Amino acid sequence: MQTIDAGVRQIALLADDSTDWGAQYGNDNTYVRVLKDLTDWIHELQQEKNDDGTAKYEGLKDTILYCPALYSYTGAGDAWYKDIPSNVQIVMTGGRTFGVASKDFADTFTKNTGRAPFMWINWPCSDMNRNTAYQYLVMGGQNNFLKPGATYGTYDGIMLNPMQQSEPSKQGIFMAADYSWNLWQSEKDGQQSWEDSFSYIDHNSPIASKGSRGLRDLAMNMRILNDGGIDGAHKDAEYDAVNKWWINNESVDYTGKLDVKGVLTELKGKLDGGTATAADFSQALTVYTTLQRAAKNYRANPGDKNMFDQIEPWISYWDDLTASAIDYITAAKQALAGDTEAAKATYATAKAAFAKSDTHTIADYYQRNKPARGGLVIVRP
């Protein structure tokens, strides 16, 4: 009641991570009853008037979000959901903790319960960086967390769990809004939304700027999402069980203009096989030079100071990482040309820059300072 008096106009009953009291006492005696009582109470408050006849709690909604203790829903039934008042929206994470908004999940849930789910997607959530030695940004991943094919009525709604950094989380929020409004019917719809997002989150315009293009080029290499293995093994093709992260098309350029993944993967294969040539290194040099320029362009032309301030540790990381990679490549080319002494000196410079890239820290979930990193799948040397 204190929050409503303070101005809150919608309430929720959030039982996630709580005891499943329904299993002990019966759901009709616990959550169904509580939700019916809450609904009746809100309806009573909606009828209250001030002395002048105006509504005492103007704008108070009777729409209640209810998140069950068993919020992931694995298809076990729960037909009792049909007894929940129609004004209550049932929150589901989509089959696992780091779940997915998909028509398949929603159709199964609706068939078994008689209700459409309100999706709570733990994306672009970066909470699990509490288990890593570094801090990362999740600037993509719609291909794994927002599946095309939904129609009107598939979901009651969608909400996201953002990153620890609120401003760059707007990139995921932009895509979720586009997904909900335009109902993506193909993966290309999601790719286009990803491309379109940066000019809007940077300077609220459909026209890209030098700064937003720089942010976009870096974000292409900062897409992973680590779930810490909380849900066990996944069958997802893009889930790396060793690193416990979704790759999320990291370093894949949807426009095809800069083949970061292709160039660097091919170079690594040739290095492992001892067949790399100066031409191979030159292609990689183009990749790292482009990323170095992207960091400089975003630093010099940010459209939103708050956004830049939260991302800055990663921009400094990219400054040093690309300088390191460029020097490593230069040293390799010098060695191939027979200039051993120059190669040694350049290698030492590269090594120092690489070490410096880990000095740009930011507090994690538990307020422990850790280095900001990106390009963890392909780009980081």
Where do the protein language model's features map onto the residues?
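Chitinase-like catalytic core of GlcNAc-active glycosidases
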Residues: 1-9
